Swiss-Prot record:
One of its GO terms (molecular function) is snoRNA binding. One of its GO terms (biological process) is rRNA processing. Involved in ribosome biogenesis; more specifically in 18S rRNA pseudouridylation and in cleavage of pre-rRNA. Pfam families: Nop10p. Keywords: Ribonucleoprotein, Ribosome biogenesis, rRNA processing. The keyword Magnesium does not apply. This is Ribosome biogenesis protein Nop10. It comes from Methanococcus maripaludis (strain C5 / ATCC BAA-1333). Transmembrane segments: none annotated. Belongs to the NOP10 family. InterPro entries: H/ACA_rnp_Nop10 (IPR007264), H/ACA_rnp_Nop10_sf (IPR036756), Nop10_arc-typ (IPR023532). One of its GO terms (cellular component) is ribonucleoprotein complex.
Length: 51
């Protein structure tokens, strides 16, 4: 089983069709890995603020 996401409402599901809007769900792809992390500064600041 793969996790899927509804493109219309953004809800995550394991089914082929969304239970909320009956739209066909699509496979979720992880973000591409890059050694140059464009958003690392923001993630670290957010993590530090939560501590």
């Amino acid at each position: 089983m793969k996790m899927k996401k509804c493109p219309k409402c953004g809800r995550y599901t394991l089914k082929d069709f969304c239970s909320e809007c009956n739209e066909k769900s699509v496979t979720v792809k992880p973000p591409r890995f890059s050694p140059v992390d464009k958003y690392g500064k923001y993630r670290r600041a957010l993590k530090k603020a939560k501590m």
